């Protein structure tokens, strides 16, 4: 079965027309710019392709989603989070979770080669497009820092009452999971219920994510896009889910 080739002004086909094999492949072509990306995410569609391939657009069924209420940190991660909360109360800033202070660096780290992977979908073109989206205030990074060194984090898209997770990395134990836990606290504080995880992995399932029928996912996205987005800003993200200026974190 063939998929449509998109020109710059071609609208996306309905997500329901995506192929079953490969699961979710919907269309190819078009442009990778913020307007196009915004239109895609609003319809439950995302780009995913390797360098040298055409621009490919996907909407898999089922869709992996982490409900914030279902976030399930391991016993060891819960201990780490409690320790970080105590350190925060004591004014210890050795380990911090920050928001939007190093978006491009987080993307570059997520694009790094990993075991078992021949390449990355986070190509220079993708990095440029999402950094432009970050400048417009809708792409965000959650970053784990130790002694002012970036050691882990994640990035994603905030549209209305929905957060679309993109990728994460860790150069220290649990560094990406700490960032995710603080993101969950922030989103919960601002009544954002779901994080889109796009595709199924055992790692995400271990943290509480589960596959949902695409139709259910699309209905939820359509319902919450009109909600106001959380009040993102550059700063330190605390365990309670509030963002403060680094000078005022105590």
UniProtKB/Swiss-Prot annotation:
GO-annotated biological processes: protein catabolic process
First-level EC class: transferase
One annotated GO molecular function: leucyl-tRNA--protein transferase activity
Keyword Coiled coil recorded: no
InterPro entries the record matches: Acyl_CoA_acyltransferase (IPR016181), Leu/Phe-tRNA_Trfase (IPR004616), Leu/Phe-tRNA_Trfase_C (IPR042203), Leu/Phe-tRNA_Trfase_N (IPR042221)
Localization of this protein: Cytoplasm
EC assignment: 2.3.2.6
GO cellular component terms, A-Z: cytoplasm
Pfam families found in the cross-reference section: Leu_Phe_trans
Listed transmembrane segments: none
Reaction it catalyzes: N-terminal L-lysyl-[protein] + L-leucyl-tRNA(Leu) = N-terminal L-leucyl-L-lysyl-[protein] + tRNA(Leu) + H(+); N-terminal L-arginyl-[protein] + L-leucyl-tRNA(Leu) = N-terminal L-leucyl-L-arginyl-[protein] + tRNA(Leu) + H(+); L-phenylalanyl-tRNA(Phe) + an N-terminal L-alpha-aminoacyl-[protein] = an N-terminal L-phenylalanyl-L-alpha-aminoacyl-[protein] + tRNA(Phe)
Keyword list, A-Z: Acyltransferase, Cytoplasm, Transferase
Family: Belongs to the L/F-transferase family.
Function: Functions in the N-end rule pathway of protein degradation where it conjugates Leu, Phe and, less efficiently, Met from aminoacyl-tRNAs to the N-termini of proteins containing an N-terminal arginine or lysine.
Annotated protein name in UniProt: Leucyl/phenylalanyl-tRNA--protein transferase
Organism annotation: Bordetella avium (strain 197N)
Gene this chain is encoded by: aat
């Amino acid at each position: 079965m063939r998929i449509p080739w998109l020109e710059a002004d071609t609208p996306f086909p309905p997500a329901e027309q995506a192929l079953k094999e490969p699961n979710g492949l919907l269309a190819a072509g078009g442009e990778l710019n913020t307007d196009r990306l915004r239109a895609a995410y609003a319809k439950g569609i995302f780009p995913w392709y390797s360098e040298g391939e055409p621009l490919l657009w996907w909407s898999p069924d089922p869709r992996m989603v982490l409900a914030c209420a279902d976030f399930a940190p391991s016993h060891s991660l819960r201990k780490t989070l409690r320790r970080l909360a105590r350190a925060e109360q004591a004014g210890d800033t050795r380990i911090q979770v920050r928001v939007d202070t190093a978006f491009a660096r987080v993307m570059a780290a997520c694009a790094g080669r990993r075991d078992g992977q021949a390449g990355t979908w986070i190509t220079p073109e993708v990095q440029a497009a999402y950094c432009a989206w970050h400048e417009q205030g809708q792409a965000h990074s959650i970053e784990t820092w130790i002694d002012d060194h970036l050691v882990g984090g994640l990035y994603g898209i905030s549209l209305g009452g929905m957060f679309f997770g993109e990728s994460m990395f860790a150069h220290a134990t649990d560094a990406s999971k700490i960032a995710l836990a603080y993101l969950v606290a922030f989103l919960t504080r601002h009544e954002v219920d779901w994080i889109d995880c796009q595709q199924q992995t055992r790692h995400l399932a271990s943290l509480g994510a589960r596959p949902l029928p695409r139709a259910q996912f699309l209905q939820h996205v359509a319902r919450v896009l009109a909600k106001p987005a959380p009040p993102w800003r550059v700063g330190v993200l605390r365990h309670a889910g509030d963002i403060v200026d680094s000078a005022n974190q105590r």
